[in-house]
UniProtKB/Swiss-Prot annotation:
The gene is hisF. Pathway: Amino-acid biosynthesis; L-histidine biosynthesis; L-histidine from 5-phospho-alpha-D-ribose 1-diphosphate: step 5/9. InterPro entries: Aldolase_TIM, His_biosynth, HisF, IGPS_HisA/HisF, RibuloseP-bd_barrel. The lineage of its organism: Bacteria, Pseudomonadati, Pseudomonadota, Alphaproteobacteria, Hyphomicrobiales. It is found in: Cytoplasm. It is an enzyme of class 4 (lyase). This is Imidazole glycerol phosphate synthase subunit HisF. It comes from Xanthobacter autotrophicus (strain ATCC BAA-1158 / Py2).
Length: 258
């Protein structure tokens, strides 16, 4: 089994971290580069930046953040948010991103995933899926993809969509349960498992982490290859080291060399 990756996620708006980072004594908790450097030193396996800047005009700010982060950090960097064209992907990769995450654009036009993967390689292309459970109690589990921060239903089945984008060339799936996101109640492991069983690429579990055992559940029960969390790390509830030690205690392989 490959080593399980622990991935903090930073939401960035107009070049600033939106959910404050309080876990270390940062001079400027709103500076994403400062936060990224702290996570790098703490032993994070990767970092995800999600650019939630509303307007496309302000894209220059995230490029500056990516450039400065890539200069100072060794961990791989995934950047998502507002990626709509092959040029967007190219620009982010040139700025220093290792992987680019595509969300709404993949829902609107599946072929974009294939075009990006063909141009830059499958290993660079992550498809982010935001899913909500739509099945009723007692029914077979069904999850639907929602866009625009979980507000807009698409009618698209999440499991089928995951299969389609992987067939087109997505090298990884970043899977967020909109039902669990921000609740601290743990991943929707049934959703994670359903997607992990349906595709042959790594699945990153996201949405709902409140305890270290939730991370273990995401791998053990959910079949994920990596776990992503925001609040538990940003607010100092747990450190990256503690997360990895808990995974190791559970018998899961992690990188503990920091």
């Amino acid at each position: 089994m490959l080593k399980v990756r622990v991935i903090p996620c930073l939401d960035v708006k107009d070049g600033r971290v939106v959910k404050g980072v309080q876990f270390v004594d940062l001079r400027d908790a709103g500076d994403p580069v400062e936060a990224a450097r702290a996570y790098d030193l703490a032993g994070a396996d990767e970092l995800t930046f999600l650019d939630i800047t509303a307007s496309h005009e302000n894209r220059g700010t995230i490029l500056d953040v990516v450039r400065r982060t890539a200069e100072q950090c060794f961990m791989p960097l995934t950047v998502g948010g507002g990626v709509r064209t092959v040029d967007d992907v190219r620009t982010l990769l040139h700025a220093g991103a290792d992987k680019v995450s595509i969300n709404t654009a993949a829902v609107n036009r599946r072929a974009f995933v294939g075009e990006a993967a063909e141009k830059f390689g499958e290993q660079c292309i992550v498809v982010a899926i935001d899913a909500k459970r739509v099945s009723k109690e007692g029914e077979e589990n069904r999850w639907e993809i929602f866009t625009h921060g979980g507000r807009t239903p698409t009618g698209i089945d999440a499991i089928q969509f995951a299969r389609e984008v992987v067939d087109l060339g997505a090298g990884e799936i970043l899977l967020t349960s909109m039902d669990r996101d921000g609740t601290g109640q743990g991943f929707d492991c049934a959703l994670t498992r359903a997607v992990a069983d349906a595709v042959h690429v790594p699945v990153i579990a996201s949405g709902g982490v409140g305890t270290l055992d939730h991370l273990v559940d995401g791998i053990r029960e959910g079949g994920a290859s990596a776990v992503l969390a925001a609040s538990i790390f940003h607010f100092g509830t747990f450190t990256i080291r503690e997360a990895k030690e808990r995974l190791a205690e559970a018998g899961l392989p992690v990188r503990l060399d920091v």
